[in-house]
């Protein structure tokens, strides 16, 4: 069921109050119905600013974090973007409204299949979904203008840094999975990488390898 106008207004107000001010990002988040990415008993909470459980022991991030990460990435209409950690597909759907091409990869085949079906239903033709080990990126499609990582790594993954174009931006949560992490904005420069700590966050860990087919 589509959200009411009042729900949408409250949703956008909550995003702005938490620092999401970029007009293009807000427009994308208004257009993409988060309710399409939340299932079961949690569907009624789709427009609350909270993370919610999804299949395979994963979560869909709270909308304000999605907005802040997208805003920090400074995505333009010509950009090629890699997302590591498809999850329900909500973040990739937002990215699709801003970028030329989006590649999103997840280690859980169950999640990528469900996300692909959602993208097809929404006619998001500029999103490519892949099942694989996202910690190694997608070398065949590199370099990327922007990379967003939606799971926490102990350090920004080297293979992803290597696949970032000069002038490109990566947004990644960094830290131990059982502790508060830091959201880091990495910019590739001519001489190396600049790191900016944005805020404290909590994400599921970035896990290497492809999950077993029968994972929950």
UniProtKB/Swiss-Prot annotation:
<dbReference type="GO" id="GO:0032259">
    <property type="term" value="P:methylation"/>
</dbReference>
<keyword id="KW-0489">Methyltransferase</keyword>
<dbReference type="InterPro" id="IPR000682">
    <property type="entry name" value="PCMT"/>
</dbReference>
<feature type="active site">
    <location>
        <position position="61"/>
    </location>
</feature>
<dbReference type="Pfam" id="PF01135">
    <property type="entry name" value="PCMT"/>
</dbReference>
<keyword id="KW-0808">Transferase</keyword>
<protein>
    <recommendedName>
        <fullName>Protein-L-isoaspartate O-methyltransferase</fullName>
        <ecNumber>2.1.1.77</ecNumber>
    </recommendedName>
</protein>
<dbReference type="GO" id="GO:0036211">
    <property type="term" value="P:protein modification process"/>
</dbReference>
<dbReference type="InterPro" id="IPR029063">
    <property type="entry name" value="SAM-dependent_MTases_sf"/>
</dbReference>
<dbReference type="GO" id="GO:0004719">
    <property type="term" value="F:protein-L-isoaspartate (D-aspartate) O-methyltransferase activity"/>
</dbReference>
<comment type="similarity">
    <text>Belongs to the methyltransferase superfamily. L-isoaspartyl/D-aspartyl protein methyltransferase family.</text>
</comment>
<dbReference type="GO" id="GO:0030091">
    <property type="term" value="P:protein repair"/>
</dbReference>
<keyword id="KW-0963">Cytoplasm</keyword>
<comment type="function">
    <text>Catalyzes the methyl esterification of L-isoaspartyl residues in peptides and proteins that result from spontaneous decomposition of normal L-aspartyl and L-asparaginyl residues. It plays a role in the repair and/or degradation of damaged proteins.</text>
</comment>
<dbReference type="GO" id="GO:0005737">
    <property type="term" value="C:cytoplasm"/>
</dbReference>
<keyword id="KW-0949">S-adenosyl-L-methionine</keyword>
